[in-house]
């Protein structure tokens, strides 16, 4: 019985130790003590109860202690609970300390929570980044299109990382400055001869205000000539004027044709009236003969005049037909 009790007690002790080691990261606690970081078992148990991974807090704390940073467990745990990347912020603080950059932990944590890569920002502060723009097109005063590509050397401004705009704003502002500088040039050869004038003009405008970067230099990498926009516009204007003139000429021709048809209709109307009047002549002549107002001699003279008039009209029509059929 005594031996059985010892076995039961031993099993209970083993189970208790297993539960303890599974709930309390004793290995991590030993590592912290060995590194000179004072962390109590109660602190680790409290992290477990607050659903904080002790390894993601104590590991960066050991790293910060070895680097000489004065950080506390509460600072790292608070940043972890806020959804931040504790390890990255600590690495950024270590890199900033090595580069003699003033970066308090609170500012680094705020930058990390804002969605910025704080470690990359510190590295960019030490090693400036080169941003290359696509070809930016502008038109000089003489109508020649000029294309320019620029390389922008920027350094991260840690004090403006929270709330400052990014690379897209830098590229857009530099592009606007290049277009404005090219457009103010009287001749495109001025841009080709002195491309550094673009850099000086754009750099003097303070384009990095309100951004998360500080522009160190703007270098024109390539300049190319595009289309003759002025000539193209003149050609298009001439073509438009031609089309307008043709449209007006067609309108005048249509009006002339309509007027001609109207005149022909009026001629036919007048001829109808003449025929109507001629149809009344025999009746009037018969009435005149009955009443003695017209003699037989007068009647035959009138007939001769009508025959003579008909012959002249026939000759005139034949002459007009011959003139129309003759080659021009």
UniProtKB/Swiss-Prot annotation:
It comes from the Bacteria. The keyword Transmembrane applies. The chain crosses the membrane at residues 1-21, 26-46. The keyword Cell membrane applies. It is a multi-pass membrane protein. InterPro entries: FloA (IPR022853). It is found in: Cell membrane; Membrane raft. Keywords: Cell membrane, Membrane, Transmembrane, Transmembrane helix. Its main location: membrane. GO terms for cellular component: membrane raft; plasma membrane. Homooligomerizes. NCBIfam families: PRK13665.1 (NF010186). Found in functional membrane microdomains (FMM) that may be equivalent to eukaryotic membrane rafts. FMMs are highly dynamic and increase in number as cells age. Flotillins are thought to be important factors in membrane fluidity. Belongs to the flotillin-like FloA family. This is Flotillin-like protein FloA. It comes from Staphylococcus haemolyticus (strain JCSC1435).
């Amino acid at each position: 019985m005594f031996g059985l009790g010892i076995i039961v007690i031993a099993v209970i002790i083993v189970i208790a130790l297993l539960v303890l080691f599974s709930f309390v990261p004793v290995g991590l606690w030993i590592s912290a003590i060995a590194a000179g970081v004072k962390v109590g078992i109660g602190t680790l148990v409290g992290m477990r109860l607050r659903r904080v991974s002790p390894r993601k807090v104590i590991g960066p704390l050991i790293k910060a202690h070895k680097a000489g940073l004065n950080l506390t467990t509460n600072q790292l745990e608070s940043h972890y609970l806020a959804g931040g990347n504790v390890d990255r912020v600590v690495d950024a603080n270590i890199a900033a300390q090595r580069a003699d950059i003033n970066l308090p932990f609170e500012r680094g944590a705020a930058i990390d929570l804002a969605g910025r890569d704080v470690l990359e920002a510190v590295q960019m502060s030490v090693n400036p980044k080169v941003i290359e723009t696509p070809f930016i097109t502008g038109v000089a005063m003489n109508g020649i299109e000029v294309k320019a590509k620029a390389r922008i050397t920027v350094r991260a401004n840690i004090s403006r990382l929270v709330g400052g705009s990014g690379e897209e704003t830098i590229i857009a502002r530099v592009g606007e400055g290049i277009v404005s500088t090219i457009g103010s040039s009287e001749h495109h050869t001025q841009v080709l001869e002195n491309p550094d004038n673009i850099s000086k003009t754009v750099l003097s405008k303070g384009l990095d205000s309100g951004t998360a970067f500080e522009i160190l230099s703007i270098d024109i990498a390539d300049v190319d000539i595009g289309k003759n926009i002025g000539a193209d516009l003149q050609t298009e204007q001439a073509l438009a004027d031609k089309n307008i003139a043709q449209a007006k000429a067609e309108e005048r021709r249509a009006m002339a044709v309509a007027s001609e048809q109207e005149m022909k209709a009026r001629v036919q109307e007048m001829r109808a009236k003449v025929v109507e009047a001629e149809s009344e002549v025999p009746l009037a002549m018969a009435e005149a003969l009955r009443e003695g107002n017209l003699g037989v001699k007068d009647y035959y003279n009138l007939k001769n005049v009508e025959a003579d008039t008909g012959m002249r009209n026939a000759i005139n029509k034949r002459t007009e037909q011959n003139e129309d059929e003759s080659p021009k």
